[in-house]
Curated annotation (Swiss-Prot):
Organism annotation: Arabidopsis thaliana
InterPro entries registered for this protein in UniProt: FLZ1/2/3 (IPR044533), Zf-FLZ_dom (IPR007650)
Lineage, top ranks: Eukaryota, Viridiplantae, Streptophyta, Embryophyta, Tracheophyta
Function: May act as an adapter to facilitate the interaction of SnRK1 complex with effector proteins, conferring tissue- and stimulus-type specific differences in the SnRK1 regulation pathway.
Compartment(s): Nucleus
Family note: Belongs to the FLZ family.
Protein name, UniProt field: FCS-Like Zinc finger 16
PANTHER family: FCS-LIKE ZINC FINGER 1-RELATED, FCS-LIKE ZINC FINGER 16
Main location: nucleus
Length: 124
C-alpha cells in the first residue's frame, strides 16, 4: 500500500516569531530582573532555603512552595511555620486596618518573598 499524504483543510497560522521576527529571543526589558530570576532558577537546588547549608546532589532534597529546596524535613517544617505565622500576622494586621480578604490578595501580589520582612524567615 502506498503512503498517501492528505493535505490539511486549513493552512497553519503563522507563529508569533514568524509575524514578529525582531522580538524573537530579545527580552532586553529589565535585564537586571531577568538576571536575578535566572540566578534564582539555576541556584535554588544549591542552598537550603532556611538554613543556607549547601545541598548535596547525592542526598535527599525536601521541596516546599515555589523553588523552595531544603536540606531536611526540619528546615522545611520551620519554613512552613514561618509562612503560617507570616500569613496569620498579615491577616491580623488587615483586620486591625479594616481590610477584607479581597484586599489581602492584593497584598500577596504586591509583596514578593524576596522583599524585606521583619520576621526571621529567610528567602532566596
Amino acid at each position: 500500500m502506498a503512503n498517501i499524504m492528505i493535505p490539511s483543510k486549513r493552512p497553519r497560522a503563522p507563529s508569533f516569531s514568524e509575524k514578529h521576527p525582531k522580538y524573537v529571543g530579545s527580552s532586553d526589558w529589565l535585564p537586571a530582573e531577568k538576571d536575578k530570576a535566572q540566578v534564582q532558577l539555576t541556584n535554588f537546588l544549591e542552598l537550603c532555603r532556611f538554613c543556607k547549608k549547601n545541598l548535596r546532589h547525592d542526598e535527599d532534597v525536601f521541596m516546599y512552595g515555589y523553588l523552595g529546596a531544603f536540606c531536611s524535613k526540619q528546615c522545611r517544617a520551620k519554613q512552613m511555620a514561618c509562612d503560617v505565622f507570616r500569613d496569620f500576622s498579615r491577616q491580623k494586621a488587615n483586620v486591625k486596618k479594616g481590610r477584607t480578604s479581597k484586599d489581602e490578595g492584593l497584598d500577596r501580589i504586591s509583596s514578593s518573598p524576596s522583599s524585606s520582612s521583619s520576621s526571621s524567615c529567610f528567602y532566596i
